[in-house]
């Protein structure tokens, strides 16, 4: 694991030095990314707080969709892939359905999605060197459980969005420290 991470870093550094004309704006935004992360997570939490009560009141199920195994994937070697897949899952499957459940929350769900898209964009710009080829079994389990819940899956997934934000934070904190 450590040797492959070192190899990725060396490849990245070689690529950075070998590519003349790279804009400093991108480099600067990446160096500021760790400092901006708490602000981006706060924006996600603020946006979620506007719809949290609605979805948690509608979520009548006792089971947990975002289990500890997902957090373990976030913290493990599949962290990049698990995060990428979960962001895609929320943006493409959960939020489009969530927007259609009540016209009063549509704008707030849309705002939450825009904040998540902003985070994804920053991650892609600054963390492209992370290995993201393998599929996460925990993400597949989340998607399968979501599908089985049918309409109730939207309430479950949206009511647990704060857990997803916490997992993002755990993943990014770990990556920033390394």
UniProtKB/Swiss-Prot annotation:
A Pfam short name: IL10
Similarity section: Belongs to the IL-10 family.
Signal peptide stretch: 1-18
SUPFAM superfamilies: 4-helical cytokines
UniProt xrefs under Gene3D superfamilies: 1.20.1250.10
Name this polypeptide is given: Interleukin-10
Subcellular location, principal: secreted
InterPro entries: 4_helix_cytokine-like_core, IL-10, IL-10/19/20/24/26, IL-10_CS
Places the protein is found: Secreted
Biological role: Major immune regulatory cytokine that acts on many cells of the immune system where it has profound anti-inflammatory functions, limiting excessive tissue disruption caused by inflammation. Mechanistically, IL10 binds to its heterotetrameric receptor comprising IL10RA and IL10RB leading to JAK1 and STAT2-mediated phosphorylation of STAT3. In turn, STAT3 translocates to the nucleus where it drives expression of anti-inflammatory mediators.
Molecular functions (GO terms): cytokine activity
A Gene Ontology cellular-component term: extracellular space
Glycosylation sites per record: 134
Biological process, per Gene Ontology: immune response; negative regulation of B cell proliferation; negative regulation of cytokine production involved in immune response; negative regulation of inflammatory response; negative regulation of interleukin-6 production; negative regulation of membrane protein ectodomain proteolysis; positive regulation of B cell apoptotic process; positive regulation of cytokine production
Keywords per UniProt: Cytokine, Disulfide bond, Glycoprotein, Secreted, Signal
Provenance organism: Macaca fascicularis
Native organism taxonomy: Eukaryota, Metazoa, Chordata, Craniata, Vertebrata
Subunit structure: Homodimer. Interacts with IL10RA and IL10RB.
Glycoprotein in keyword set: yes
Cysteine-cysteine disulfides: 30-126, 80-132
């Amino acid at each position: 694991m450590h040797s492959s991470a070192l190899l990725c870093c060396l490849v990245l550094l070689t690529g950075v030095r070998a590519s003349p004309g790279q804009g400093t704006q991108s480099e600067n935004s990446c160096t500021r990314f760790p400092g901006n992360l708490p602000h981006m997570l706060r924006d996600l939490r603020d946006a979620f707080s506007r719809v949290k009560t609605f979805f948690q009141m509608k979520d009548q199920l006792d089971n947990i969709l975002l289990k500890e195994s997902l957090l373990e994937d976030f913290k493990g070697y599949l962290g990049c892939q698990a995060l990428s897949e979960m962001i895609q899952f929320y943006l493409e499957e959960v939020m489009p359905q969530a927007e259609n459940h009540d016209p009063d929350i549509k704008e707030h769900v849309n705002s939450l999605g825009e904040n998540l898209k902003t985070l994804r964009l920053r991650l892609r710009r600054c963390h492209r060197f992370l290995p993201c080829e393998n599929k996460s079994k925990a993400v597949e389990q989340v998607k399968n459980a979501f599908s089985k819940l049918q309409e109730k899956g939207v309430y479950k997934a949206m009511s647990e969005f704060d857990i997803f934000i916490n997992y993002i934070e755990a993943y990014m904190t770990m990556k920033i420290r390394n």
